[in-house]
Amino acid sequence: MNRSANPEAASSTSHVKFDLGKSVDISSTDTKDGGTARSPLEPADKSDTTESKSESGSDSRSEEDKESPASIKEIKAETPQPKDRPGVQIKLSWSQKIKSWTAKKKRKLYQLVIDIIMMNRVCKMFRQGLRGFREYQIIEPVHKKHPDFSFWDKKKQGRISFVTEDFAAQEGHFPPRAISITQKKPSWRTHQEIQDLCNILQALDCYRSYTESLQLLLAKVIRFERFGRRRVIVKKGQMGNSFYFIYLGTVAITEDEDGSSAFLDPHPTLLHRGGSFGEMGLLSTTVRSATVVCMEETEFLVVDREDFVANKLGDEVQKETQYRYNFFRNLDIFQSWSEEKLWKLVALGRIERFSYGQMVSKDFMNSAFITFICQGNCEILRLVALGDCSAYYKWVWQQLELLDHKPLRIHDNEISPKERFKELQIKSYPLQDFTYLKLLRLQKAREQQGIDFHGKINKVENTLPKLLGPKIKSRFGHLVKCSMVNTKFGELPKEAIVGVYMKIHKTEEGEIVGLHQAFVPEIQRDCRPFILLSLGSELIQVRKEKFYDMVDEETRAKIIKMDVDYPSDEDLCQSFLKENDYIVFRKDLLRLLVEPLNKSPFIPVQTKKKEIYNHKSLFLDLCSLEKKVKQHYPIFLAPQKYLPPLRVVQAISAPRHKIQELLPQYKNAGVLI
């Protein structure tokens, strides 16, 4: 029986010898027979040499130094071998180990450099790919330590908790807890869950228009759906089975079946968050007359036909339809229309609600819709580029004369013939005075008429034109050094190229917007863009081409008669400059009279809090054209079709005299004489 197989018979001692300066050698000693187990991977002759070398390992260090380099540089180690495998002997020279270690080190360093380069390239590719998303800030959801809070209720003798995450919605999406409620059957929803859904749906304008009892019924039967871009929700020619509320996203209404025209039409019929569609198809058995397609990822709240009929939601839809009919019937323009024709017009439009300050149309002149004002008011605005108006050009240089003391004609591009002739005279005879020639001619003319001329002219000294002497003082101020922009009237400072929104008209209930110059030849039309801004209104929008198909001669004559011309940009610019002069004068006067009285030396100066709005954002200061001061406030830019964005202002402060110089009664600050 082999004693090496018995773990107790194995040698309990192992000899490990390290000589870092020499070599590394690992060998195992056998028990009793002194034999060594040979590795099956080594030949027999090699095992013999290994035994002879292991015996010489017990010599002194001085003898090891004298031996050959192959057998000298070694470190011997004797370890017990497991019973299931023979002893293994590994011998490598020190030079080989150094080379292998250096190669491994270089290989790892090279691999590390390659990994770093690869990571940099990947990061660069991600940055280039995400260039379009720089406006958005990607925030990872942070785990909250205490996502809910609770308090003790004395009446119920229990703790009431409120979980904030159940009601949290990201980027306007439908809350997850609300989605889980809508996935239940209507009969399984509790009263509290229905009330929670009703509170969440208050964000939709069309939902708020219903009565409270009907809102609870809708919250009980409603279900949630989410569809991606280009998904057709309602197809033309099919039966309608559902009624949709738009919670998030945008849909388009088209005439084709696949909805592809919505992505090609420059002015598609769009419905946004808070809109609804599909209710008319549930009131009758007729097929759908239009296709509804998603323009982006959209979230819907859907009411099916059986729930729609069971909860008598059709009565509310009929009320809205009757409301539109009554509105159109009361307008003078439709008094001659028949009932059938008017009901067709009612089917073409739908009621939309816009909050205060919400833009209805960027350019209703080129829009595809006609807007009827049912309730509330709207404003018609015009963005006037002041740099394109001659009145503004003259006004700017008149104000800047206080800085450079140069007349307006110097900055003109075109010079009148009279001014051109004067310049020719000055260039031909520079710095010369011809006043004596006029006096001589005047004296001769009066002598011929027999009129005595008092005063004599020294002809000897004035035979030649005299040069301008030091008595004539030229008044030149410092030059205004700033970047200039060429306009059709001349040069203007770049900072002075601004725009202003001017209110043209305020609409009332019953007015129609979008029929301005509708039947005027296209060459004679006013193609300027006009903005329609809501002040809290309820509107009905109808497509122009469908409305024009229904217009008869009598209605056309009424439309032409009610047409009104809008003022030109030049008139709007002049009215703005007049109003601006009054605004600036009023501010200066209030500052002169009121501010000195409000100052108190005993009140410590308090640091102003940072605010979102800064009055300097909408204020242009022509006095600081030369000052290169970094602006610490935002400015508002309005996009233009073929030109760079235009800065929008509300007032312009120009160089001006002090009020004390113009009005002596305000000489002392805070005192009116």
Curated annotation (Swiss-Prot):
Essential for male fertility. Plays an important role in spermatogenesis and regulates sperm motility by controlling the development of the flagellar bending of sperm. The gene is Cnbd2. Gene3D superfamilies: Jelly Rolls. This is Cyclic nucleotide-binding domain-containing protein 2. It is found in: Cytoplasm, Cytosol. A nucleoside 3',5'-cyclic phosphate binds at residues 206-329. Residues 1-15 have a biased composition (Polar residues). Residues 1-89 are annotated as: Disordered. Residues 43-86 have a biased composition (Basic and acidic residues). The keyword Zinc-finger does not apply. Disruption phenotype: Males are either infertile due to a lack of sperm resulting from spermatogenic arrest, or subfertile due to impaired sperm motility. The motility defect is caused by altered Ca(2+) regulation of the flagellar beat of sperm. One of its GO terms (molecular function) is cAMP binding. The keyword ATP-binding does not apply. It comes from Mus musculus (Mouse). The lineage of its organism: Eukaryota, Metazoa, Chordata, Craniata, Vertebrata. It holds the Pfam family cNMP_binding. GO terms for biological process: spermatogenesis. Signal peptide: none annotated. Keywords: cAMP, cAMP-binding, Cytoplasm, Nucleotide-binding. One of its GO terms (cellular component) is cytosol. Testis-specific. Exclusively expressed in testicular germ cells while it is not present in mature sperm (at protein level).
